[in-house]
A protein has these predicted regions:
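N-terminal basic/disordered segments at the start of proteins
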Residues: 2-28
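Gly/Ser/Thr-rich loops at beta-strand to alpha-helix junctions
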Residues: 11-17, 81-93, 120, 136-142
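N-terminal beta-loop-helix "entrance" segment that forms/cooperates
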Residues: 34-60
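Glycine-rich, highly charged phosphate/nucleotide-binding loops
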Residues: 54-72
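Glycine/small-residue-rich loop that forms an oxyanion/phosphate-binding "nest" at active or ligand-binding sites
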Residues: 76, 83-106
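Hydrophobic, well-structured mid-protein blocks that either form specific transmembrane helices
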Residues: 96-150
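Conserved small/polar residues in nucleotide/adenosyl-binding loops
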Residues: 154-156
Length: 156
């Protein structure tokens, strides 16, 4: 029996990789399980440069993006900007996920939301991580912000 899934993604406007990488992963999954079919839908938050001052302004657009994707009746929604979430402070991934899920419900198309930051923190907990090595495409202050966020939540 065929199962159709609509995958929604909130992505920074300057990101040029996620909209090719995620569909490729979904297609690879479908090749292993042909009964699972996916459509991929994205909405963009405006951001030209990954700088702390732009991250909060960009995150403010995530509510609009969640509404747009809920118009498409997506089954799940991912927020694909780890540093934007982490720049907002300790535990913000939970706040964001809850708020965006509420926006989809208010639009009559409730969809669970996961952020890349939340997925990373959850995965590190599940794995019982004792050490972390981080390679990041950010300037040193933003990389330190990411490390501080992770360390504050997983207690290594």
């Amino acid at each position: 029996m065929t199962k159709n899934f609509r995958i929604g993604q909130i992505v920074p406007s300057s990101n040029t990789t996620m909209e090719t990488e995620v569909p490729a992963m979904l297609q690879a999954h479908s090749s292993l399980r042909p009964e699972d079919r996916f459509t991929f839908h994205s909405s963009r938050m405006r951001m030209k440069k990954v700088q702390k001052e732009e991250l909060a302004a960009m995150d403010a657009e995530s509510d609009r993006c969640a509404l747009e994707l809920s118009d498409a009746r997506v089954d799940v929604l991912g927020y694909a900007c780890l540093v934007a979430i982490m720049a907002m402070g300790r535990g913000y991934h939970r706040v964001s996920q809850k708020r965006l899920t509420e926006r989809t419900a208010e639009n009559g198309a409730s969809a669970p939301v996961i952020t890349s930051a939340g997925a990373l923190v959850d995965a590190l907990h599940v794995m019982g991580a004792k050490k972390i090595a981080l390679v990041a495409p950010y300037v040193v202050p933003l990389t330190e912000l990411v490390m501080d966020y992770i360390l504050s939540l997983i207690h290594i």
